[in-house]
Amino acid sequence: MSVRTRWLLLACAAAILVGHSLVYNFVTDDAYISFVYSRNFAEHGELSFNLGHPVEGYTNFSWTVLLGLFMLIKIPPEISSRVLGTLCALGTLWLTFRIVTRALGDKSPWAVVAPILLACSSGFACWTSGGLETQLFTVLVTGALDALVAACERPRAIRRMGVLLAFASMTRPEGPLVAVAFGAARYIQCLVTTRRWLPGKDELYAAAWFLGLWGPWFAWRWWYYGYPFPNTYYVKASGDWVNPAMADEMVAQGYYYLRVWLTQTRLVYMLPFAAIGLAAPDARTPRFALTFGCALLALVYLPYAVSVGGDFMGLHRFIMPMFVIAAIAVVLGLETVFGRWPRVAAAVVVVTVLAFAVTQIDLTRTSTLSCAHRDFAHGPDHCVADHGVIDTPAFLMVYTEDRATIGRAMKDCFRPDDFSILGGAGAQPYFAEMRGIDVFGLVSDTIAHGDPRSRARAGHTKWGSQANLAAYDPTFVFSCYKLHDTPTPPPLGCGWAGFEPITMHIPGLLEQGEYYTFLAKKSRHFDCPGRVK
């Protein structure tokens, strides 16, 4: 295949991905948590959710700071995050193309197949949008894999792997896990090919770059926030269980999360080819570096994902680097089996890509069907949490849009000394510019370190106790709420002494009606345009 044709097909993959991601074109509620930190960083020089009380309720330092820098030039994060996510995803397509080219040769037509598969993937396209750091982390990991492969022929290339993995580790907490996998892959390959037990100069430089960048940052954030790990770790993966059986439930949910990934991506049908693709007997070749690095990463990353229960967001943003690994492995497997017969190989590739695209078109369609005005307890499957745990993109979209609408409508109703207990610390506090903490404890060190794990759901294992929540002396309790379609509020099913239910009419709410009932302290004498009296 000519160079021109390969680049033309890569450009087609890029166009497919951009169009595919625009079908989703949303920002999920969790992204707005980082946006609050970005705004406080840009406007006040503080990486905190509530000014004056730094709590590390985010795990994406580099992404949060980057969005904050764009806010300094008046570009809002709900725009910059989507543009940057798309650019990072396009970078991943190019790096994947380059990686396969390194492994199979400059003229190999197989190099364009993996980017096309990624562009067609519903999960990859969904989280190209979404507003999260997912694609920044993925492009950094893919860049590190490219450096690992390139180092077979140019040993100095391994140095940039250390730099990229340092930034990856400042973007997602799984970064050090990737560093261990790729570092082990490089060390073992060198050991097998050179019989040298000690790392070489280039490997030492790579380690120095990693530690020199990541180490000072780790020390700074420990000093700044007071704990060695992010607050989200203590909320999601630390502490005793109220019921010890919940630990097993989390692992079972992790296996289910992995199974859904295998079935939705149709990778379950291509596992034999992926296994064949990850076999490379000659340890001196770039192909061995690629397949060994991919295999080691999968062996540590997937069990880790299972151990924490997977994720509560649909379409697998939590294991996005595995999309790249899977695409590469499948392509290498197909090349191994059919590569000697070019015409057969071409037919197999066309059929594989078209069949995959058809399944992903249907998945994207169902993932983006509107959930407006639905009763989610009895509604269609695309609006109900899968297995009671994994929220669909369709639900995430309508949930976030409603919280953004509430925040905008109530922004001018808050006083500087008001404090809120929130159900989600995302779009609602971002647009309302309110102070508060979420009942799950993501931005509360009190809940993170003071409450046990009581819910077997990924990312939401803790729920603030009444005593710990009351210690904040809140003015509003938004975690106790109802959305409804008539002015008369239904029973809330929860209550606080000294608080009263408040009902607001907020035009534009989509989920279950335009009326929103929550709790406010009676002594606040709360009034706001739109209050139903």
Tell me the role of every PLM-derived stretch.
Residues 1-533:
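Membrane-proximal envelope and lipid/glycan-remodeling enzymes
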